[in-house]
Amino acid sequence: MAMTYHLDVVSAEQQMFSGLVEKIQVTGSEGELGIFPGHAPLLTAIKPGMIRIVKQFGHEEFIYLSGGILEVQPGSVTVLADTAIRGQDLDEARALEAKRKAEEHIKSSHGDVDYAQASAELAKAIAKLRVIELTKKAM
């Protein structure tokens, strides 16, 4: 039997996941993180993107995170997300429209603030589309 640890993924609205996992993959403030059983304690910010959860027995789940905090403790990991949406609950048409609008804003931005905000919106839309794509493949 594979080694596991307990994972909780919660947002301000609801608890998205609670259970035993073999590993997770998430984007932290310093880059990609793979958290396996026995990982050293860690507290870090999470960038907008996805969390890839490999549950006990190898089943995968993908959740979009708009940002948040990751805490790793012996035997348990907690993700406190600003916003969390399961891959199957994301609207592909809406994400494509958000991506298109963000690309338009980037082209028409007139200052650093406009560009930074549009870039952040584009990154979120691309992350949502990636979660949708991976969720479809996993089904």
UniProtKB/Swiss-Prot annotation:
Task: Name the major location.
Answer: membrane
The membrane topology of this protein is:
Peripheral membrane protein
- Which UniProt keywords are present, listed alphabetically? ATP synthesis, Cell inner membrane, Cell membrane, CF(1), Hydrogen ion transport, Ion transport, Membrane, Transport
Q: Name one GO molecular function term.
A: proton-transporting ATP synthase activity, rotational mechanism
What the entry lists under InterPro entries is as follows: ATP_F1_dsu/esu_C_sf (IPR036794), ATP_synth_F1_dsu/esu (IPR001469), ATP_synth_F1_dsu/esu_N (IPR020546), ATP_synth_F1_esu_C (IPR020547), ATPsynth_dsu/esu_N (IPR036771)
- Matching Gene3D superfamilies: ATP synthase delta/epsilon subunit, C-terminal domain (1.20.5.440), F0F1 ATP synthase delta/epsilon subunit, N-terminal (2.60.15.10)
Please give the GO cellular component terms listed in this UniProt entry.
plasma membrane; proton-transporting ATP synthase complex
Q: Which domain of life is it from?
A: Bacteria
Location in the cell reads: Cell inner membrane
Transmembrane ranges, per UniProt, are none
What is the annotated signal peptide range for this record? Answer: none
Q: Name one Pfam family in it.
A: ATP-synt_DE_N
**The protein's assembly and partners:** F-type ATPases have 2 components, CF(1) - the catalytic core - and CF(0) - the membrane proton channel. CF(1) has five subunits: alpha(3), beta(3), gamma(1), delta(1), epsilon(1). CF(0) has three main subunits: a, b and c.
Q: What does this protein do?
A: Produces ATP from ADP in the presence of a proton gradient across the membrane.
Alphabetized HAMAP family for the sequence:
ATP_synth_epsil_bac
The family note in this entry says: Belongs to the ATPase epsilon chain family.
- Name the chain's protein: ATP synthase epsilon chain
